[in-house]
Amino acid sequence: MAVLSCKGNQKSSLSIILTIFVLGFRRAAINTSSPMKILIDNGHGIQTKGKRSPDGKLLEYAYTRELARQIVKILKSRGYDSELLVPKDDDIPLSERVRRTNAHCQALGKSNVILISLHLNAAGDGTKWMNATGWSCYTCKGQTESDRLADCLYKAAEQILKNQVIRTDYARDGDADWEENFYILRHSLCPAVLTENFFMDSLRDRDFLMSQIGKKGIVDTHIKGILNYISFFFAIPH
């Protein structure tokens, strides 16, 4: 039987106390009496010019809405409070998307809401095929809670999209996500990220996106990343 010294017990006790304090602090930042609201945004709309593959077979507004609906459906089936930020096909202005997001933040508390905006990437103007490829996730500039959400999504992508290119930007601030002051990220009060789910003007990515394996991989990546983020605070198994 191992015997700990008094000094060892003191260190162990201190470690336990610090752990409890940190977990308590994290959870205090979230109103646990109110469920986490998971908002899923889908890029652009039916009226948005361009935003398609060069052959016209892949439309960003339609594709992101298809996957967003699947993500919300799966989350709801597992008992989570999730909804589409833009349920219709119309291209809702960014200011209105932010207004809807922040209305939830004001009602529930900004720490009880997260926003994930789904998009497809493009390297050119949509008239010809390009060579860029891969999945990536964006946050606004600076260190915020959005970085933790992005980290959870990146870890999920690395596990699920194993044979695909995962685009990272560790050089800027030491974490994987890319940083841009996109309007919806900069003005949303809650943790918010924007995922660029491969390139619609890459033949390689276009074929993957349109495959059932590709669609499932992207949906599963978002589900796993979101649930990993929520479980970090609430210790909810998934």
Where are these regions (language model features)?
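Solvent-exposed loop/turn segments at secondary-structure junctions
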Residues: 45-46, 88-92, 120-126, 142-145, ...
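Extracytoplasmic/secreted envelope proteins and their assembly/folding machinery
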Residues: 68, 72, 95-98, 134, ...
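Active-site-adjacent substrate-binding region
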Residues: 146-174
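Structural recognition of the beta-strand scaffold that forms the well-ordered cores
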Residues: 37-41, 82-86, 113-118, 136-139, ...
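Active-site histidine-acidic residue metal-binding/catalytic motifs
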Residues: 30-100, 124-125, 131-133
